[in-house]
């Protein structure tokens, strides 16, 4: 059994439209050839992984093979599960060895993946162990959203089975729960959005306490009382659980209809660094611009291959070493026999979905995936897939696009005076900023979707760039 003994987030994501995270995990145990195992990494990543939709894409230095699409995220466990296998004939034995995995997570722009509608409690809601009516601070952020801070002291953790919460091997073997009622809150709290539930740094000196995550497993609201089940997610049987917790949450006071219909993944936008900061979004025809695709780094602005809700995956000819692919029926260049070896440069990350007519595996280690950009298509091999660039709507690095699409007037970050900001810690201000970022992306996403459509048949020319001359570069992830 492979067991993670330690983990560390080595790169914090800051991408606008995706997240790129590197996790270092210290492993212990033996893995034999031909048998896959589930590795649970109890990393708290939900601040930057959309709806918990994570893709593990491996790393060049790994001994382990990671299934490209076999990743599950558990909000209950506060971590992600992935399938790992041994690609070698001999057993792999790990003795506290560090393995690095690259995680890729698209954002899908709901107000928050932590969105919880606060319905009145049912008769089966557990009896609360405490009623909190003091140590409550409420700040109004706008007409629709309020910030609430609550201090919970003297928590006595119990087995979650007492509270009818889900159980199972992947739903919390080392978790403890605590039901509590918070009294005298503002009326008409509709939903809980972003929140933080954290311990005080000076409440426990144990290292095991540091690795325990805390979430809200269940929430209800009736009249002026908020009912919560707090859950501590330990990482081992020696886990330590804090006695005092601080809750900071952003609540809406009414329904936000724009958050009801959120697609699984939007196609990429044509954005360069500061376009959203200028409140404009350039709409670019990829066949009439220079679009340079490079290996993903945490500085990449955006490049998406849409998933099954948006994509059209087609067969192409099988790629062979020594040949550069372009579109079927177009120019194909054969390299001379004495050419230098083709050396892959870095890893490329793409979301791929199995189609019945494609005839290919639905996952492959990312280090084996290479890509080529032709005039109108992005080609992935050895998966033998093509993506139309007008469907991908890739990045345009033009500093002066022919025309821009002015975004609608939507909620921006409210302007708070300095005296008001003194009420919040750095973490709380970051929480508020992340929430309004996600709110803005949701409105932007909905607006752009009304102006674009799925493409079928003939090539769709984006109307803002009809006068531009063709200048598409042909790029591959190779050095010669």
Swiss-Prot record:
It comes from the Viruses. This is Protein U54. The lineage of its organism: Viruses, Duplodnaviria, Heunggongvirae, Peploviricota, Herviviricetes.
């Amino acid at each position: 059994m492979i067991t993670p003994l330690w983990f560390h987030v080595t790169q914090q994501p800051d991408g606008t439209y995706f997240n790129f995270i590197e996790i270092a995990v210290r492993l212990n145990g033996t893995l034999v050839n031909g048998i896959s195992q589930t590795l649970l990494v109890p990393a708290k990543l939900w601040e930057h992984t959309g709806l918990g939709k994570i893709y593990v894409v491996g790393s060049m230095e790994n001994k382990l093979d990671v299934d490209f699409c076999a990743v599950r995220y558990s909000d209950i466990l506060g971590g992600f599960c992935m399938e790992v296998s041994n690609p070698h004939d001999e057993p792999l034995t790990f003795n506290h060895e560090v393995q690095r995995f690259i995680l890729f997570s698209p954002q899908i722009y709901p107000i928050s993946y932590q969105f919880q509608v606060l319905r009145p409690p049912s008769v089966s809601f557990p009896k609360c162990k405490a009623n909190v009516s003091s140590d409550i601070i409420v700040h109004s952020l706008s007409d629709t959203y309020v910030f609430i801070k609550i201090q919970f002291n003297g928590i006595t953790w119990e087995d979650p089975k007492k509270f009818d919460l889900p159980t199972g091997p992947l739903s919390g073997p080392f978790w403890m729960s605590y039901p509590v009622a918070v009294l005298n809150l503002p009326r008409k709290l509709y939903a809980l959005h972003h929140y933080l539930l954290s311990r005080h740094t000076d409440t426990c000196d144990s290292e095991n306490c540091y690795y325990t995550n805390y979430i809200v497993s269940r929430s209800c609201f009736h009249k002026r009382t908020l009912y919560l089940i707090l859950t501590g997610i330990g990482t081992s049987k020696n886990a330590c659980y804090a006695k005092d917790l601080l809750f900071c949450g952003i609540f809406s006071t009414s329904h936000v209809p724009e958050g009801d219909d959120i697609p699984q993944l939007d196609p990429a936008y044509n954005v360069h660094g500061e376009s959203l900061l200028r409140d404009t979004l350039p709409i670019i025809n990829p066949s009439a611009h220079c679009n340079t695709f490079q290996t993903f780094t945490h500085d990449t602005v955006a490049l998406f291959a849409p998933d099954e809700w948006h994509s059209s995956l087609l067969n192409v000819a099988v790629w062979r070493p020594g040949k550069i692919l372009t579109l079927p029926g177009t120019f194909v260049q054969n390299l001379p026999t004495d050419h230098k070896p083709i050396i892959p440069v870095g890893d490329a990350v793409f979301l791929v979905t199995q189609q019945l007519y494609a005839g290919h595996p639905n996952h492959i280690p990312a280090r084996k995936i290479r890509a080529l950009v032709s005039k109108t298509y992005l080609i992935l091999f050895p998966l033998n897939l093509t993506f139309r660039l007008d469907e991908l709507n890739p990045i345009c690095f033009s500093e002066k696009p022919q025309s821009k699409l002015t975004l609608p007037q939507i909620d921006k970050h409210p302007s708070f005076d300095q005296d008001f900001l003194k009420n919040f810690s750095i973490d709380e201000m970051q929480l508020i900023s992340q929430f309004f970022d996600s709110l803005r992306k949701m409105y932007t996403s909905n607006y752009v979707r009304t102006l674009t459509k799925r493409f079928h048949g003939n090539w769709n020319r984006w109307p803002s760039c009809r006068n531009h001359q063709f200048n598409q570069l042909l790029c591959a992830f190779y050095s010669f």
